[in-house]
Design a protein with these regions (language model features):
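Gly/Ser-rich "nucleophile elbow"/oxyanion-hole loop immediately N-terminal to the catalytic nucleophile
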Residues: 2-40, 55
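Alpha-helical scaffolding within the catalytic cores
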Residues: 18, 46, 63-72, 93, ...
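Second-shell loop/turn segments in exported
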Residues: 2-8, 86-88, 121
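C-terminal catalytic histidine-bearing segment of alpha/beta-hydrolase fold enzymes
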Residues: 78-82, 88-141
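Short beta-strand immediately N-terminal to the catalytic nucleophile in serine-hydrolase-like folds
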Residues: 35-37, 62, 82
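Short glycine-enriched nucleophile-adjacent loop
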Residues: 42-53
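A conserved short beta-strand
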Residues: 54-65
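Extracellular/periplasmic catalytic domains that process cell-envelope and extracellular macromolecules
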Residues: 28, 40-41, 72-75, 104-105
């Protein structure tokens, strides 16, 4: 089970500092900041969206997981969650619970599960029809 409360790691602190340096540039559209991650990066995607929901217009965690109680803080971020139902590395139930928690919080969330797909659900996710069109059409609410 994922922890409910976690201090921000030094790596994530550095990542946020890097992100902030880009956000300070005038040519960056601050209404179109997206985050995508797979496996442990999917967990990081959830974590960053939870910690800094004001930054992201959309998040795409692929085969990640998170403690669902933490997700209420990210309800203003649009989510598209992908997972394979045969994943034996990161349990699919984590994505299912995340979807239900986001839905209950009133988030704009979509969940796509790939039957028979193992841990490499990023392959069908990145090939999902309209993947990039959906992402690039998202703007902060």
């Amino acid at each position: 089970e994922m922890p409910v409360v976690q201090d921000i790691s030094p790596i994530f602190k550095s990542l946020k500092e890097l992100l902030d340096s880009y956000l300070a540039l005038p040519q960056i559209d601050k209404n179109r900041i997206y985050i995508i991650g797979l496996s442990m990066g999917g967990m990081g995607t959830y974590d960053m969206a939870i910690r800094f929901p004001e930054v992201f217009a959309a998040a795409i965690p692929i085969c990640g997981t998170v403690h669902p109680i933490r997700l209420a803080n990210a309800k203003g971020v649009r989510f598209r969650i992908f997972h394979g139902d045969a994943d034996n590395v990161v349990t699919v139930e984590g994505s299912r619970m995340a979807y239900r928690a986001l839905k209950a919080a009133g988030a704009d969330v979509e969940y796509i599960e790939f039957p028979g797909c193992g841990h490499d659900s990023w392959t069908p996710a990145f090939n999902y029809p309209g993947f990039m069109d959906w992402l690039f059409s998202q703007k902060k609410k």
